């Protein structure tokens, strides 16, 4: 129409399958239509909106049931969860040499366990949803578990020097590292339960934690490296805690004194090399800066 311009703020939608759903529960999305121009006050039809619906021809596997779920873990590639899925007794294994990117699609996946193979170099990525499971990795440095933007109802792993990255996650129950796991927490992380540290862990970004427990360590010199905005409610040390196990605080802000454990026990908390601490401020926050 002369004298009038119009546009949508979003012209394409990627919707989950509506198969086996009622109309009122079918997936939806919205877009806004804006108009401008000198003819905006005229009272007449401005045009026709055409909606084209096409099937998804990508290489992403839609997971609707346990059979689809097993197939996704038997094959590499990409998968997306179509609906909430409960596999309480389902023990999933990612096969040797396979990589899987699994988009939980804001849905909930509940399974008994997920494991990586005994001899492979797999990368498993879980993103954008809620999951409750036990993850078992099997001691190869080439294995990677990446959990991105997820709520975790308990995450533990039997893990020997494999690599685990948690990014922008909320963990509702206990989270622990065991048998040499190398963990990296990035972005915004909120653990409402207890985090138990046995081996090397690196945390960077905004991190909120109810209880941090450093348990008995019988070998090695595990280090917990912190940087970013760190808020920890309670520190807990096992009775046989070794002085060699260090908590190292880098640049960032802390709600505890980051250069000593305030009860004086073992002196397990220290500043990273080249850092200084100031504070606390009126809110009890200490600031660590790198020189």
Q: What are these regions, as identified by a protein language model?
A:
Residues 94-98, 197-198, 219, 282:
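A short, compositionally biased
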Residues 1-6, 11-13, 18-21, 26-31, ...:
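Solvent-exposed loop/turn tips at the surfaces of repeat/solenoid architectures
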Residues 71-76, 94-96, 118-120, 140, ...:
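Flexible, charged surface loops at secondary-structure boundaries
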């Amino acid at each position: 129409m002369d004298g009038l311009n119009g546009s949508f703020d979003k012209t394409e939608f990627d919707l989950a399958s509506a198969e086996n759903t009622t109309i009122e529960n079918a997936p939806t999305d919205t877009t806004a239509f804006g108009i401008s121009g000198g003819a905006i006050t005229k009272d007449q039809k401005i045009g026709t909106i055409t909606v084209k619906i096409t099937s998804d021809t990508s290489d992403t596997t839609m997971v609707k049931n346990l059979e689809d779920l097993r197939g996704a873990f038997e094959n590499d590639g990409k998968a997306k969860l179509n609906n909430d899925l409960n596999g309480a007794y389902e023990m999933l294994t990612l096969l040797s040499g396979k990589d899987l990117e699994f988009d939980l699609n804001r849905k909930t996946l509940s399974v008994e366990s997920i494991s990586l193979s005994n001899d492979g170099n797999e990368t498993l990525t879980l993103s954008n949803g809620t999951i409750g499971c036990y993850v078992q990795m099997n001691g190869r440095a080439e294995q990677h578990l990446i959990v991105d933007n997820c709520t975790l109802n308990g995450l533990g792993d039997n893990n020997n020097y494999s690599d685990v990255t948690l990014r922008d996650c909320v963990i509702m129950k206990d989270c622990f590292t065991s048998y040499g796991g190398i963990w990296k927490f990035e972005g915004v992380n909120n653990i409402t339960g207890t985090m138990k540290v046995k081996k090397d862990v690196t945390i960077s970004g905004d991190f909120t934690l109810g209880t941090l427990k450093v348990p008995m360590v019988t070998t090695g010199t595990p280090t917990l490296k912190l940087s970013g905005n760190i808020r920890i409610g309670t520190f807990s040390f096992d009775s046989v805690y070794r002085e060699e196990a260090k908590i190292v605080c880098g640049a960032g802000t802390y709600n505890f004194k980051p250069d000593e454990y305030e009860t004086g026990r073992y002196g397990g908390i220290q500043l990273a090399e080249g850092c200084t601490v100031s504070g606390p401020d009126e809110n009890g926050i200490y600031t660590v800066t790198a020189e």
